[in-house]
């Protein structure tokens, strides 16, 4: 039944079929596409990102190894990036049977939507499943008291499909990023409450509308993957599957040094030791620079001229940040 549905789908749809992709967080394949420079040279040496280059070369050399000319092997690898909005698979009318989907529709190559044959309907996108150590993550920020991050996932449709529904997963706490993503390593975190809304200004989505899916992502100590399924409700059972790389950052860690530097400037002004200090603008980065680290250490030592009372009060302020 599954193979028959796939054949009927191939006959029924037009040649141009892209439908959508994760834009917040950003899907692996879209990052590779957006970087560009994957058309020359054929072997992928021009791909700027290391992980994307590794994915390209995986597909390219797979077909070169069986005698495909460089141009054909390159076309297979380029297709993986070009079709960033068509990471799709066909489940048939039993698309709600998740065990069927796991067993027969996507038993492997989850990030590539089980596409691992350049001669098949959806091509070969297996490079997206390379367990490379350096896939670029989007950052989710939490403070020291949070064990999860709540936000709206955005799925950017190049063609709207209604009715439909979403399922959102993240890799488990124990997942090793040196291993590919498998169903056994995924934890379901939601998908209910999704809605088609006006694009609120998502920089990675050019569509006027997008799907917004509220989720709460549990904390992970290292890099992890979000896996999203967008499933059409129709007899063909076409679904779209995307991986996005994530890591948690701590707002306190990011901004601590910038705020410490501001506290130093304020203290020096109060003591008339720095009348010409320049106030940082609102866009001051939270990334700790060397002067900001020195400012932090300065406050830890007690402030200007070791004036203990003033220094102590500022230290208490820093500890509260």
UniProtKB/Swiss-Prot annotation:
Disordered as annotated region, ranges: 301-321
Gene3D superfamilies, per the entry: chitin-binding protein cbp21
Keywords linked to the UniProt accession: Disulfide bond, Glycoprotein, Host membrane, Late protein, Membrane, Signal, Viral occlusion body
SUPFAM superfamilies membership: E set domains
Compartment(s) where it occurs, according to its Swiss-Prot or TrEMBL record: Host membrane
A Pfam family of this chain: LPMO_10
Parts forming coiled coils: none
Keyword Membrane in annotation: yes
Glycosylation sites noted in the Swiss-Prot or TrEMBL record: 192
Subunit structure: Homodimer; disulfide-linked.
Function: Component of the virus occlusion bodies, which are large proteinaceous structures (polyhedra), that protect the virus from the outside environment for extended periods until they are ingested by insect larvae.
Protein known as: Spheroidin-like protein
Lineage per the UniProt record: Viruses, Viruses incertae sedis, Naldaviricetes, Lefavirales, Baculoviridae
């Amino acid at each position: 039944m599954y193979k028959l549905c796939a054949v009927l789908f191939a006959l029924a749809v037009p040649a141009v079929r892209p439908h959508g992709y994760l834009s917040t967080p950003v899907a692996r394949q879209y990052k590779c596409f957006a970087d560009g420079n994957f058309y020359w040279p054929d072997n992928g040496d021009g791909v700027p990102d290391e992980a994307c280059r590794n994915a390209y070369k995986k597909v390219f050399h797979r077909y070169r190894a069986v005698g495909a000319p460089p141009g054909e092997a390159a076309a297979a690898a380029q297709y993986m990036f070009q079709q960033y909005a068509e990471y799709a698979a066909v489940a048939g009318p039993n698309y709600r049977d998740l065990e069927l989907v796991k067993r027969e529709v996507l038993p492997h190559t989850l990030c590539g939507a089980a596409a691992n044959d350049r001669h098949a309907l959806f091509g070969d996108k297996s490079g997206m499943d390379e367990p490379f150590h350096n896939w670029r993550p989007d950052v989710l920020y939490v403070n020291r008291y949070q064990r999860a991050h709540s936000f709206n996932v955005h799925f950017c449709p190049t063609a709207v499909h209604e009715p439909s529904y979403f399922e959102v997963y993240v890799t488990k706490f124990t997942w090793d990023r040196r291993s590919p993503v498998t169903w056994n390593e995924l934890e379901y975190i939601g998908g209910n409450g999704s809605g088609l809304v006006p694009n609120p200004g998502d920089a990675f989505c050019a569509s006027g509308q997008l799907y917004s899916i509220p989720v709460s992502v549990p904390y992970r100590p290292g890099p992890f993957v979000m896996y999203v399924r967008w499933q059409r409700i129709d007899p063909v059972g076409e679904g779209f599957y995307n991986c996005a790389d994530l890591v948690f950052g701590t707002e306190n860690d990011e901004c601590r040094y910038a705020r410490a530097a501001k506290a130093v400037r304020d203290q020096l002004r109060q003591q008339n030791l720095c009348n010409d200090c320049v106030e940082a603008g609102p866009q001051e980065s939270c990334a700790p620079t060397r002067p900001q680290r020195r400012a932090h250490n300065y406050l830890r030592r007690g402030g200007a001229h070791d004036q203990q009372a003033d220094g102590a009060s500022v230290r208490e302020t820093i500890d509260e940040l």
